[in-house]
């Protein structure tokens, strides 16, 4: 994990994630949802990356690391002009059942962030919006905080009229732990 990253967590019981996804879909965003219960090993992680990204390419006979290339190429078959929202359902379940695959899936999302946020900004394309988050149950919040070494914020609300906006005000009860965030 890169220092300075803050990972957005959505508490499963709050339904905020479902409402945000619905608002983003209405605004024309592309949604990639990795479903943790579909992942148990490298082969199932590969299949889940293909499923979640709607990748039109067939699965090659290689290990999971080739899918890092797939997540960088989504813009070849999806229209990302309005934005891209990536989230992992039941991430706490994946951490508990397969911590190595949870780490590998996180690396895929980090690669997507590099490609669709940082590279685009560096190249002067400030219009592409990229947001990602992880869903977990409230009871397993400590487990997920530990996985991300405490660098988390809980999304406790969003503006349905502007679901793409991220700010310190939109961050949950741990926001006071990150005073360096803009207000």
Model-based region annotation:
Residues 1-59, 75-183:
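N-terminal intrinsically disordered, low-complexity segments enriched in P/E/S/T
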